[in-house]
Regions:
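Phosphate/diphosphate-binding loops
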Residues: 274-308, 382-393, 419-444
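His/Asp/Glu-enriched, well-ordered alpha-helical/loop segment
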Residues: 343-353, 360-383, 393-397, 408-530, ...
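Bacterial N-terminal signal peptides
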Residues: 6-17
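Distinct, well-ordered alpha-helical segments
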Residues: 263-265, 291-302, 362-375, 398
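Divalent metal-binding segments
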Residues: 26-32, 41-297, 310-357, 361, ...
Length: 564
């Protein structure tokens, strides 16, 4: 009889959220007396949870979970603080952002040009003369009281002895004279394709270079790279910065300026067991016209899903074919090329994420997807479209039928005023149509598209989701398109995990799942909406390891020794 009863008790404990770990082994860590937002329908909130061997073994009341503690268990009193599942950015260019983290200045949270210049000045004071200072994006003039871009004179006053490069999205960059000299730019002929030096009415250069994606990416390519050892260290630092904001995972869609060596610092941290963020990455298109050939070659050595829980290859995108990248009027030949790539990917059961900005042209992409789907059902592959802020009900309906998900970022937080001016209020009030997509049952992943376009701060993105306001405070979306706080949090956790086939392993807090979580500085569910963006983590755990801790929990951060 004993052999029958024990399994039944284990099942009962597991379904109650307490797991089967009560038999014989103590938890490594127990968190007590908190407000735990689990996103588990069976137990939406809890007071405590226990962790062992990197996984959650119990979730429930403090009294129940305390039973999992024993000799050697680390006990953490949450003192009523809110805990959420670890945040997962479903579309962040984290690998690239990490490489320049040490030399970059961010303007996140600055509300005036003098405040932004103070950050430049502080960077100059801690830098050697001649050392580069870079603002690689993540800002807009709408965040400043002045509602304008900074000037070259303002940069010079803040950093007279350093070359300074300030990027505005992928449309413009401001350089100081020292930066122009270092990059050997004196005339328009020296500017990468499609770009030009902006000049005032009297012909005097303003310091700004105006262009498009190839222009600005070409400029960035000219900036000096850190050494390999420096890149490893700054990647470690950048991931800790993400941990400070409760981020435990990212999906990286490749990007401009990324070459094979760009991935080596990430791989080094992985090999050393020193990653603190789970990274899932995809392969950006390489040679124009040779995209399919390149995918076929690379994936013979790097198959779909290769890696582990910390670093894993997850297919191709976000640029799948150069001829279809930001192309609203593709030729039949370009559509055929995309079809051949998608057809091959479907035959290999490979995931794809596709960059697409405008609803007016997304029918070209959907036509290709439907053609592939008639031959090989694509819903099981969890393909996705990224961006598409103005998606129409018709486009969303076609996505739903195909089983294609939507990777949504807070572009309208930074670009809302410009979108409103260009498209008008009727389009703005539905940009993006979050609740329309949710009610259709389309999988949605939350993210930022950081860091050249937006800030990597997930709480800024979450605040924008629920209040619909731009960085300048302009209301945009209709109330009917505003998700609840829990819905928004779900996009950033379980929603993002779905796209990497991880929703059964992470994204919510329940027994058996990976112990990825964040203890927050404020109650995400009840703090004033306008304060959500100021939220940070006091403690971040990934796989049971406390990778970031501050304030009352600083003692718990686990420092991994540097490799020999």
């Amino acid at each position: 009889m004993k052999s029958i009863i024990a399994p039944l008790v284990a099942v009962a404990l597991s379904t109650s959220g307490l797991g089967s770990a009560a038999f014989g082994q103590n938890a490594d860590t127990v968190l007590l007396n908190g407000k735990i937002v689990t996103l588990d329908a069976a137990m939406p909130t809890a007071e405590a949870l226990a962790v062992r061997d990197g996984k959650i073994v119990a979730v429930g009341t403090s009294a129940d979970v305390r039973a999992f503690a024993g000799a050697g268990t680390r006990m953490i009193d949450l003192e009523g603080r809110t805990v959420v599942p670890g945040l997962i950015d479903s579309h962040m260019h984290a690998i690239r952002a990490a490489l320049f983290y040490a030399t970059e200045v961010n303007w996140i949270g600055t509300s005036s040009i003098p405040a932004a210049m103070e950050r430049i000045k502080a960077a100059a004071q801690r830098s050697k003369p001649g050392q580069w200072i870079i603002v690689a994006g993540g800002w807009t003039e709408q965040q400043f009281r002045e509602k304008r871009r900074p000037t070259q004179a303002e940069l010079l006053a803040a950093a007279p002895d350093n070359p300074v490069y300030v990027q505005l999205f992928y449309s413009a960059a401001l350089l100081t004279p020292a930066a122009y000299k270092a990059l050997n730019i004196t005339t328009d002929a020296d500017v990468p394709p499609s770009g030009k030096i902006e000049r005032a009415a009297d012909g005097t250069p303003t310091g700004w270079i105006i262009g498009d994606n190839p222009t600005i990416s070409g400029l960035f390519d000219k900036l000096p790279l850190p050494t390999f050892d420096e890149s490893v260290e700054v990647t470690r630092q950048f991931f800790r910065e993400l941990n400070r904001l409760g981020i435990t995972g990212v999906s990286d869609p490749g990007g401009f300026n990324l070459t094979a060596p760009s991935y080596q610092p990430l791989f080094k941290l992985w090999q050393d067991g020193a990653l603190t963020v789970r990274v899932v990455y995809s392969l950006f298109a390489q040679r124009r016209g040779k995209e399919l050939e390149d995918y076929q070659t690379v994936t013979q050595m790097l198959p779909m899903g290769f890696g582990d829980d910390w670093l894993r290859f997850n297919g191709i995108g976000e640029n799948v074919a150069w001829g279809m990248y930001n192309n609203d009027n593709p030729t039949e030949a370009q559509k055929e090329q995309l079809y051949q790539i998608y057809k091959w990917a479907a035959s290999r059961r490979m995931t794809i994420t596709q960059h697409w900005n405008n609803n007016r042209s997304v029918h070209h992409l959907l036509d290709v997807l439907e053609r592939v789907d008639r031959e090989t059902p694509i819903a099981p592959l969890r393909w996705s479209i990224a961006h598409l802020n103005d998606a129409s009900p018709e486009s969303l309906g076609r996505m739903k039928t195909l089983g294609v998900g939507w990777l949504m970022q807070n572009a309208m937080y930074f670009n809302g005023e410009a979108f409103l001016k260009a498209r008008g209020n009727e389009a703005m009030r539905l940009a993006p149509p979050i609740m329309t997509a949710l009610k259709l049952g389309i999988p949605i992943g939350g993210g930022t598209d950081a860091h050249r376009v937006m800030s990597y701060n997930p709480f800024v993105s979450l605040q924008w989701m629920v209040d619909g306001k731009t960085v300048g405070g302009t209301p945009t979306r209709d109330e009917e398109q505003l998700p609840t706080r829990e819905e928004a949090l779900r996009f950033y956790t379980l929603g993002s995990a779905w796209f990497t086939f991880d929703d059964e392993r992470r994204g919510s807090l329940k027994a058996g799942k990976l112990a990825d979580l964040a203890v927050l500085t404020r109650d995400y569910l009840t703090t004033p909406t306008g304060d959500i963006g100021a939220t940070e983590a006091l403690l971040t755990m990934v796989g049971g390891r406390i990778v970031y801790a501050a304030g009352p929990y600083a003692q718990f951060e686990e420092k991994r020794p540097a490799p020999p």
